[in-house]
């Protein structure tokens, strides 16, 4: 199975996977408006790949088959201040004292 992978300039790390190159017919219009002008990144041969980085291969295949597209969202950014406070045994956010 082949799929086309597109990126957006609107949000780094967001990718749209399609079962056919340049066939956006199954992608909802509001999603296309939010995604913006898609830029082709690559064509993947899913049968020849065991892993796909951050994407679950079986979920990708299922979504392409059922919905006709798959939207990969960027990974959640870690809040370094909250992580540091937790490592010190503090709450994630400081108490507000005015």
UniProtKB/Swiss-Prot annotation:
It comes from the Bacteria. Residues 77-98 are annotated as: Disordered. Residues 1-85 form the YcgL domain. InterPro entries: YcgL-like_sf, YcgL_dom. Pfam families: YcgL. This is YcgL domain-containing protein MADE_1012200.
